[in-house]
Design a protein with these regions (language model features):
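A short beta-turn/loop motif at secondary-structure boundaries
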Residues: 36, 60-61, 97-100
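Short hydrophobic/aromatic beta-strand micro-patches
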Residues: 13, 70-74, 108
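N-terminal beta-strand motif that seeds the catalytic metal site of vicinal oxygen chelate
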Residues: 1-18, 69, 123-124
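Vicinal oxygen chelate
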Residues: 3, 82-83, 87-124
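Short beta-strand micro-motifs in enzyme catalytic cores
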Residues: 40-42, 67, 101-105
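A generic structural signal for short beta-strands and their flanking turns/coil linkers
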Residues: 8, 40, 49, 65-69, ...
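Core segments of cupin and vicinal oxygen chelate
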Residues: 13-51
Length: 124
């Protein structure tokens, strides 16, 4: 058995690295911790989680996938966050809906990658 201590990072494909960095920084204040000079990729950080943004020119996201990144948000901030998504004309594909005793909203980044804001945390 291979023993995994934790997830190191999550990687997503983007068609325009600079646009994606701006999206994640402006909307969520994610910190850019590394931007490769010899490749079109960068790592952003939220809490203890790293997300790798990997540019592939001409990338077209496959629609209909359930792949997503779920981001925990405090209950008292949820409605304001949904308002901010709407104010920024960000495409909402699901919700906001009641889910697991809380709420969830799923929306798209500029490349159609699905992101979810939700509460409460999953109990595992």
């Amino acid at each position: 058995m291979i023993v995994i201590e934790s997830i190191d990072h999550i990687g997503i494909t983007v068609s325009n690295l600079d646009r994606s960095i701006e999206f994640y920084r402006e909307l969520f204040d994610f910190e850019v911790v590394e931007k490769m000079s010899n490749a079109r990729e960068a790592f952003i950080k939220v809490g203890e989680v790293m997300i790798g943004l990997f540019e592939i020119e001409g990338y077209a996201n496959q629609q209909g996938s359930k792949n997503h990144i779920s981001l925990f948000i405090d209950e008292e901030d949820f409605d304001d966050a949904v308002d901010e998504l709407r104010e920024n004309d960000i495409t909402i594909v699901f919700g906001p809906e009641n889910l697991r005793g809380g709420k969830s909203v799923v929306f798209l980044d500029p490349d159609g990658n699905q992101l979810e804001l939700c509460y409460p945390r999953m109990n595992i």
